[in-house]
Amino acid sequence: MTEQGPLRPLNPQGFFPLLNKLSTWMWKNGDTPLEHGPCVSCADLKGWLDMLNEPLQPHHMPPRPSRQATPAQIIILGFLGIILAGALLLMLPVSSRMGVVTPFSDALLTATSATCVTGLVVHDTATYWSPFGHLVLLALIQTGGMGVVTVAVSVVMFSGRKIGLRQRWVMQESISAPQVGGIVRMTSFILKAMLLIEGTGALLLSLRFCPQFGLLQGLWYGIFHSVSAFCNAGFDLMGTSAPFSSLTGYVGDPLVWGPIALLILAGGLGFLTWQDLREHRLHFRAYRLQSKLILVSTAGLLLLSFLFFQCYEFRLPQWAELSGWERLNAAAFQAVTPRTAGFNSVDLTLLSEPGKLVTILLMLVGGSPGSTAGGFKVTTLAVLLLSARAVFFRCGSPSCFGRRFQDEALRSASAIFLMYLVFFLLGGTLICCIDGVPLLDALFESASAIGTVGLSICGTPGLSLPSHLILTFLMYVGRVGGLTMIYAVTSGSPVSSQYPQERVTVG
């Protein structure tokens, strides 16, 4: 009798091939009597049993689920990290003019407002924060306007390190690019365009501020307000004349509100639109469909809002102290600034009820995808309106400019619109219940937060801490995007199966 070696552990993965062979043999010979049919040979039996004794191979192991963060998770965590770091810096005594420690709640709201390029503040920017605090705010505004991922990729580019496929993938999601290819060139173009636009705006504003505030302070004011306007942040340093006054002292000065309005529009058009403008110039037909929708929708919103403010709002008795020239300037600027900018050239508390409502709608719409602006975006509005037109006229799929939309665009637009509407109504209702402010004013504050605008009527400093936390959450959701938040939370969820269709009547 030969001595047997130690028993090896059975390979569980060999069970399935064995089961497959046995079932095949039984299927072929199941109807044959055992005494007349073929039987299993010893060689076959030995080969089958050896399957169970085969050692485990590395390639037999099932792949482990990836634990790498998704682009959506990277984006929301990046913004959260920048906000917390900014809040800690603003809490330092060196950040305030009085050299005191700023409460964490105030620092958190201010840092969130700066990073999310909103403009809602509890302390006047010019009088409360020190020059160091202003630098911190400017860095947060620039980082939030460009996007955390864009800034990180830019640092990697300048360091000379190679940008991998995963970084390109995250960058594509961050700027809403149509494809990964050419994303590095796109990032380089964004940086150059940003520096050119902000530099030009700073120069134009300095020509007006330097004679008024002196050379150094005028240059600093030009740089700060240029970056704040291009990033659609709405932070200003004009509180030295009157706290929270914004640009009310320049209502009839186009040398100030004009460059700021142009900077707001440039930042709100989106990076892809800039690329089309650079490559195709005035050849509108050569633009991609998204750029056409952005330009046409933006022009339409600007025209309609300007006509409303000029023909109705600023003809009311409460604006009688403004001259005809100042009313024209105020109407033009008021049509632009609700596009998530946050500057104001008039006292917004004097707005009529229809004026407040129109401003709320403009703040909710916001700017364009892949831009420094917030809101549920003009492309979302365009897709919904064109889809409604297709339903009304029974045109089949919604289309424009000789192109039709994919079904995913309509589903995403509906989800984004509903999400913003729910957060806007819920936030405004909670603020109204907590602080007892009028509902329309509370909705104005809520729309300003989730649209990352920064305009205020009821006065953010006068609200309670729970309302401040609500506004902080709304600003964060409005900047990172509703779908980005959902994708980050639901990543890794199993794909649902396709169920049978059944007709449902709507409307």
Label each PLM-derived region with a short phrase.
Residues 3-4, 8-15, 35:
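Short basic-hydrophobic amphipathic alpha-helical segments used for membrane targeting/insertion
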Residues 13-29, 39-507:
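Membrane-proximal intracellular helices of multi-pass ion channels
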Residues 2, 29-30:
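Intrinsic disorder/low-complexity segments enriched in small, polar and charged residues
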Residues 2-3, 52:
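N-terminal acidic, proline/glycine-rich, low-complexity intrinsically disordered segments
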